Amino acid sequence: MIEAARRLPRKVFLPYPDAKKLAEDPFPALQSWLTEIERSNRGQRFLLCLDEYERLDEVVKATNSRAPLNFIRNLLQHHQKWILLFSGSRELSELEDYWSDYLINTRALRMTYLQESEARDLISNPVENFTNIYELTAVNEIIRLTRCQPFLVQLVCYELVELLNGDIRRNQGNADTVKATAQNVEEIIPQVLEVGVQYFRELWRSLAESDRNLLRRLIQGETPTPQDKGVVRKLVRKEILTVEGDAFQVPLVQKYVEQVLEEE
């Protein structure tokens, strides 16, 4: 990372951190390193991205120390040149109460589905001058299966391209005339669930047992009861169930849950 930063067109000089101090007490060492970066790149601002930020909760519990969160709070309060971007699958309301003490100056932004027009454009024109490889029925089926969830749209499209390329190689077909069909989309669903297993598994793992029980009952054909109101509200907010609470928002997610239940 350090060498790559120095090769950027707009060069960023990242000093090497003290490996010994990092091993002994990592978070104070990281604070010192970030200060060194500021001194070495005067006049610049920095974006620090923390993906799956909720994993820090596991570190706090495993070490019985809130050092990671103290590090974040220190950075937010005392390093104005740094912008922190947290991303994850859990809302702040789902984390332990003490998190709010450390993220006072943050702002929450919900990342949701693409607009259908945006998803269609992503499918048909992912890069400039992309050859049209989809029949309209295939595009419609991708939209239906993913409900325009951006990661799933791209995952399905990637697997479709792999399928078409494999067919072209095996049958010596013409790449300019081969197009994906709705049937092709259905064919790759098992592969999509396998390749995207980390996404689906994390989604399932983030659910409480009461959430999972309701999904099991829905798969079995039952409908929510008044006692399920709180769980339904939560699963709607997490974009798993529709507002009526009796159907999945994303068919691919439903297929994964069905697969999980079959394996139980």
State each model region's role.
Residues 149, 192-193, 208, 240-264:
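Short capping/hinge segments at domain boundaries that bridge a core fold to an adjacent linker or tail
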